[in-house]
């Protein structure tokens, strides 16, 4: 990362709100924290659900926000505002590729299958040394406990090495995630 350029933080999360107000609170806190730190934000481009909340919060705080959305999702996921910078891709894979290329770190908030797909994409690429960018999973109200358990089970069953657990940080909430992110961005690259 160019030391003169402010970090771009990619946020993966649901295009729905989920069933607990704590999910929305965490999304808004992450967006506000990104803006307060002076970082920019990259996200999936839609204005619905947690994705919209985190982007609107970051934008309201003055952060530059870059949306990336596949053409076929534009009708389902309207932009957060007319001012939103939006890159339209032909497919989901191009969206994920651009998110990786344009970002210096990743925050994962609660979401559905798309969020898990995005998490595993960047985690596998970190495992294969495609990148050494920090990945912070925000475990709001234990949402990602089962993910962490599954990855431990994968190691116990002999399908992964313990180094898999070093691919991501598990944060208890938005404040902890932002603190971890600040430290990770200022630390030497993980190998």
Regions found by a protein language model. Give the residues of each.
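Flexible, glycine/proline-enriched loop segments at strand-loop-helix junctions
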Residues: 109-110, 134-138, 165-168
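Active-site/ligand-binding-proximal alpha/beta "capping" segment
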Residues: 94-129, 136, 187-191
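A cross-family phosphate/adenosyl-ligand binding-site feature
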Residues: 2-102, 140-191
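Arginine/glycine-rich "motif VI" loop of SF2 helicases in the C-terminal RecA-like domain
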Residues: 59, 125-133, 159-160
């Amino acid at each position: 990362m160019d030391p003169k350029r402010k970090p771009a933080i990619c946020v993966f999360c649901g295009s729905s709100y989920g069933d607990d107000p704590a999910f929305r609170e965490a999304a808004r806190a992450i967006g506000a924290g990104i803006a307060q730190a002076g970082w920019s934000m990259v996200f999936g481009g839609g204005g619905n659900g947690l994705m919209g909340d985190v982007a609107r919060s970051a934008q309201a705080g003055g952060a530059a926000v870059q949306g990336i959305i596949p053409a076929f999702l534009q009708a389902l996921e309207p932009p957060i505002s007319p001012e939103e910078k939006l890159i339209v891709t032909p497919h989901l894979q191009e969206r994920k590729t651009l998110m990786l290329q344009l970002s210096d770190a990743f925050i994962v908030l609660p979401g559905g299958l798309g969020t898990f797909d995005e998490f595993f994409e960047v985690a596998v690429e970190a495992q294969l040394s495609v990148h050494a960018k920090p990945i912070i999973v925000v475990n709001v109200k234990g949402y990602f406990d089962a993910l962490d358990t599954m990855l431990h089970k994968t190691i116990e069953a002999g399908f992964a090495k313990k180094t898999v657990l070093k691919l991501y940080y598990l944060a208890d909430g938005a404040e902890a995630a932002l603190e971890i992110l600040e430290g990770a961005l200022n630390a030497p690259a993980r190998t």
